[in-house]
Regions:
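Bacterial N-terminal signal peptides that target proteins for export
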Residues: 2-16
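Boundary at the C-terminal end of the N-terminal hydrophobic targeting segment
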Residues: 28-30
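N-terminal mature ectodomain segment of secretory-pathway/periplasmic proteins
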Residues: 32-117
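Gly/Pro-enriched, hydrophobic low-complexity segments
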Residues: 38, 89, 100, 110-114, ...
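Short amphipathic beta-strand and strand-loop transition segments with alternating hydrophobic
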Residues: 73-76, 154-160, 214-215
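Short solvent-exposed loop/turn micro-motifs enriched in small/polar/acidic residues
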Residues: 79, 94, 105-106, 151, ...
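Surface-exposed beta-loop interaction hotspot
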Residues: 145-151, 158
């Protein structure tokens, strides 16, 4: 009996040690995932403001393309998330439509949509931000900036993607109204630039893949992808954003990102 008791004690000790090791390993992977996310986010620091022209191509499963033109402006807010405004310039049926976004580090983001036909500004409720943005495969949630504090992170592995060594990090949105249960993010090891995101829907199915291409560096520090593609695996559609005429330090102020500025944006 003494030998059996000794064996049970050894098994119990081994079990406790395994649990402690698993906890430590889990914390290390979580911390590494967060560290990678923070380093990636630093690519967006200190740009002050930016502007660009955008082309949005909506491609259905038959390969037919609808093209829209936009102007995009962004303002850095050092103490919180960034502000942005996207204004449609063509075609005629969406001309003047604008979306204003205030990203926040912790609380839910604020978004407003201006519809010129109705001459009114409509606030987008948090629970509706998973819906498609004006017929594209991007959601309203995708059009807001992904602040580091909005997610829990776990480092998964290293993997080669497009001939680039990448970290693969899993992040889970803390927002209960997010359209995603989790996202897998590929971040290159050289510059900590996001290369690809797999988006999983509320049923944990792989809903969309987001690709970031043609990164270019501005003023020696600010990285801007000139192409972002969103592929919807459930409906076979794709949306592509093409960026051009990128400029930093335009002198924008908070006044350029107010609800009244939406009405002046035509």
């Amino acid at each position: 009996m003494k030998g059996l008791s000794h064996l049970k004690n050894k098994q119990f000790t081994a079990l406790v040690m395994a649990m402690i090791l698993a906890s430590i390993t889990g914390n290390l992977f979580a911390n590494k995932g967060l560290e990678i996310a923070i380093l990636s986010d630093k690519n967006n620091d200190d740009f002050i403001d930016s502007s660009s022209s955008m082309t949005m191509n909506l491609i259905n499963k038959r390969g037919e393309v609808v093209t829209r033109k936009l102007r995009f402006k962004r303002l850095e807010v050092p103490t919180d998330g960034d502000k942005s405004i996207a204004i449609f310039e063509s075609p005629r049926d969406v001309k003047g439509v604008a979306i204003l976004s205030y990203a926040h580090k912790v609380k839910a983001d604020d978004q407003w949509l201006y519809l010129p036909a109705l001459k009114r500004v409509k606030r987008i409720a948090s629970k509706n931000k998973s819906g498609p943005f004006l017929g594209s495969e991007f959601s309203f949630e995708d059009f807001s900036f992904q602040e580091v504090e909005k997610y829990d992170y776990v480092y998964l592995k290293e993997e080669i993607y497009q001939e680039k060594p990448c970290y693969v990090v899993e992040r889970k949105p803390l927002d209960p109204y997010s359209g995603y249960t989790k996202q897998l993010v590929w971040i290159d090891k050289e510059n900590y630039l996001v290369q690809k995101i797999h988006h999983f829907d509320r049923k944990s199915f792989h809903l969309k893949t987001q690709l970031f291409k043609d990164y270019r560096k501005y003023e020696g520090f600010f990285w801007q992808p000139h192409e972002i593609e969103m592929i919807n695996h459930q409906n076979g559609k794709r949306s592509i954003l093409l960026f051009d005429d990128v400029k930093l330090k335009n002198g924008f102020t908070d006044r350029d990102f107010s609800q009244n500025s939406l009405k002046r944006s035509r």
